[in-house]
Amino acid sequence: MFERLASPSWRSSVLAEVRFGPKALRGTVPWLLRTRLRQIDSLLQVALKNAAEAPHDLAYEMEHEHLTWSELANATSRVAHVLAAAGVKRGDVVALFAENSPFYIASVLGMTRVGATAALVNTNLRGRPLAHAVEVSKARVVLVSHTLESGLRECEELCQSLDRILTFDDNPYAGLLANTPATPYPQARVQAEDDFIYIYTSGTTGLPKPCRVSHARAILAGAGFGPLMYDFRPGDKLYCVLPLYHANGLLLGVSAAMLARVPMALRRSFSASAFWDDVHRYKATAILYIGELCRYLVNSPPHPKELPNPVRVAVGNGLRPDIWPRFKSRFGIESIREFYGATEAPGFIANISGREGSVGRVPLGGLAGWLRIIQYDVDLDQHLRDSRGFCIPCADDEVGELLIRVPKIAAGGLEYRGYTDESATEKKLLRNVFKKGDQYFRSGDLLRRDADGFYYFVDRIGDTFRWKGENVSTAEVADVITHNDGIEQATVIGVPVPNMDGQAGLAAVVPSGEFDPDRFWRAVSDLPAYAQPRFVRVMDGLATTGTFKIQKNDLKKEGVDPSSVGDPLYVRTKAGYELLNEERWLDVKEGRLKL
């Protein structure tokens, strides 16, 4: 530790952040104080405060829809009236299954208004995973957009706790909300420690798990990200194409902008061809990204409006080191602020100094042991411990699993909550790490830290991988595959593909007879598009460990190059699963065959 303190580069990087720090804290600390002194316990109260102080200022816009702060406040009241009429009361959970729109935000805050928790369901889910997401939240009512209603109806019988489905169309104010009372709905008593939303995350148990986010944590996320990452200024506008059912969109987008009273421009989903048109149309000065979005833009043909553009700052995560400088220079982005975190984690890392490729650093937190990287044996799938039974810290630039210390004492809704399922929460905790009785959150990610204290993402561990900006549970995909006739055994892994972000899904299967690619296509069609395997490897058997765990590491090392894999390989195309030969593999590598 003392050698690091003596390092000139480490000292200079700390000083750079100290110089930046007071500027950021001038925004962060006052907000924290104001929320404390004025007893603002929820984002609903922030929205109502904005409506009282700036009723005619723009809050949200999308295409031809514009919502001022006063109109947003009115919409939350009308949503609350509808929910109350459906029997929703304080302490209930309401599932929200809808695409991005200003009404989405009004719906979430309307649920707060009646004292309910909003379960934000991934719009890509269908069939059993969708039914599970609704059922595990214990929601009795689902608020769904008309474009997604049919998918929900198809699995309605699997949702045993579900009583009501409330559907809204493209103009909910003339439809679902048309006959609501004009009088404001009285606010339910909401405390900062109450659950605000459930955000679903995929993990090793397979199906989506709801992660609990309190009102306090939602406020803290926005209060920190607004000044620290965006450095919001008068006249700013945030453009968000990321789904609002994810933490990035709702907590790091909506919460941050609302607390700073910065308007947001939304889009239903990302479009590379329309991105710069929208940026100019909305005069967006800040954008929220995931790495895949940046890669799409960099690999897109030149757009007449890409330069000059009004974007000053881009905030997000997952930006690959090779894409970072190309994205910044091609589009003239003044500042890129990368971060690392997870919805269920008790902390995050932020890169406010702009070092390319890094997810950031926490100089004081790192010294205090808040973040630790420990030795992890990928082949044995276990942490290494010393003769005393404690974990072994990694040296500089040594790859290991990132751990985040769980505070022993926290209050006011800021304590670590994890998932609604206590057993799932328990699986994310590692105890007796460096001393008896301590506990850390397992990130499930491999990172390294350099001599200057900067952290770098390396890979995911085990049973999840990331593709198209979504976490894919290998257990969930394998479960769907093996539930269909024709497949005796299956395992799923993520494999890197040249010039692609994340990892593509590879299903290694042992068929009961001759492999039928059309039958396999039908078997995985209920999975979200991003979770459907891009590659299939047909094998005679799957090697297992002494404890009968399927050995995945050899499959990962061998990958999907047909010149080095002896088994038949298939690749997912628009026509279905087709044999992957060396010619098709070349098309994949050079981008002619889209995955």
Give short role names for the model-derived ranges:
Residues 35-40, 44, 56-101, 105-109, ...:
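Conserved AMP-binding/adenylate-forming core of the ANL superfamily
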Residues 259, 281-289, 298-378, 419:
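Gly/Ser/Thr-rich phosphate-binding loop
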Residues 219-237, 247-285, 300:
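Conserved AMP-binding/adenylation subdomain of ANL enzymes
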Residues 2-19, 81, 85-86, 109, ...:
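Structural core segment of the AMP-binding/adenylate-forming
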Residues 526-550, 567-592:
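AMP-binding/adenylate-forming catalytic domain of the ANL superfamily
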Residues 56, 167, 181-200, 207, ...:
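Conserved pre-ATP/AMP-binding loop-to-beta segment of ANL
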Residues 68-70, 189, 196-220:
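Conserved AMP-binding A3 loop
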Residues 125, 132, 142-144, 404-532, ...:
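AMP-binding/adenylate-forming catalytic core of the ANL superfamily
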